[in-house]
Swiss-Prot record:
InterPro entries: Aldolase_TIM, DapA-like, Dehydro-deoxyglucarate_dehyd. This is Probable 5-dehydro-4-deoxyglucarate dehydratase. GO terms for biological process: D-glucarate catabolic process. Pfam families: DHDPS. HAMAP family: KDGDH. Signal peptide: none annotated.
């Protein structure tokens, strides 16, 4: 799949990023991950991101990373395109990018470089080096220490033909508008704020109709119904789901840092697809939070 073909796929439909399965000892549980992917793939997501933020990319050892990407690619080969999360220091990100390409990933989601603060020019150099190390398509994730502006993104797009997408995890509307207007159809644009459904209508109005859904991990039918309601401007359905599910869900998610991942793993366990515990430094939901989430999920009905 060439970068432009991937760009076309990412320009419509719902995206998601499966949680990564760990066993009771905290090790990668391949069989559980295969079962999860086989369950989620038929629900109609346009693409899945393996080892993304919700997939606890930041906690995977190099050999585990390879195992996760290979498992996802092999399992979903005939059903849905797999993009691989890559990130961290430039040379580490390049190694991961080349490994993901070797294993058959259709594209990459370039997560932020690690801890170091850097100038716009430095971040742009980092992105360019990763893009030029592979032939597959790259989506850049503006989040945390990665905050590229429209000018530098435009320059990167000129120098890197395989830079095909921009995912926004900042929520800076002025920046999002400037990027969308400046780069036009050169990139595809993805909403990437945690629990993106809450922002989906606003982002669609900005020209960003596609987003990645975390709750697809445990209520895929509801997640697809919400996306279709957004696409159809069905404000009644959107409003009801936000009131009945997403706002109470956010109340649980916002209680502790890191719960954006923990709550998704809890949801997967509730619906019978236990992915095991989160890895430190994340912490799992407390029992009362788990029970509150279970009630919300039950109210959404069979998936």
């Amino acid at each position: 799949m060439n970068p432009q073909e991937l760009k076309s796929i990412l320009s419509s439909g719902l995206l998601s990023f499966p949680v990564t399965d760990f066993d009771a000892a905290g090790d990668f549980h391949q069989a559980g991950y295969v079962r999860r992917l086989e369950w989620l793939a038929p629900y109609g997501a346009s693409a899945l991101f393996a080892a993304g933020g919700t997939g606890e990319f930041f906690s995977l050892a190099p050999d585990e990373y390879s195992a996760v990407i290979k498992t996802a690619v092999d399992t979903c080969e005939k059903s849905v395109p797999i993009l691989a999360g890559v990130g961290g220091p430039t040379r580490v990100a390049i190694q991961m990018a080349q490994e993901a390409e070797r294993l058959g990933a259709k594209g990459l989601l370039l997560l932020p470089h690690y801890l170091t603060e850097a100038s716009q020019e430095g971040v742009a150099a980092h992105v360019e080096q990763v893009c030029k190390a592979v032939k597959i398509g790259v989506v850049i994730y503006n989040r945390n220490v990665c905050r590229l502006n429209a000018n530098l993104l435009e320059q990167l797009a000129e120098r890197c033909p395989n830079l095909i997408g921009y995912k926004d995890g900042l929520g800076d509307i002025e920046l999002m508008v400037s990027i969308r207007r400046r780069l036009g159809e050169r990139l595809t644009y993805l909403g990437g704020l945690p629990t993106a459904e809450v922002y989906a209508a606003a982002y669609k109005a900005l020209g960003v109709p596609v987003y990645s859904s975390a709750v697809f991990n445990f209520i895929p039918k509801t997640a697809m119904a919400f996306y279709k309601a957004i696409a159809a401007d069905d404000q009644a359905t959107v409003g009801k789901l936000i009131d009945d599910f997403f706002l109470p869900y956010l109340d649980i998610r916002n209680r502790r840092a890191g719960y954006a991942v923990s709550i998704v793993k809890a949801g997967a366990k509730i619906v019978g697809y236990d992915a095991g515990p989160v890895r430190a430094p994340l912490t799992d939901l407390l029992p009362e939070e788990y029970e509150a989430l279970a009630k919300l999920i039950e109210a959404q009905g069979a998936q």
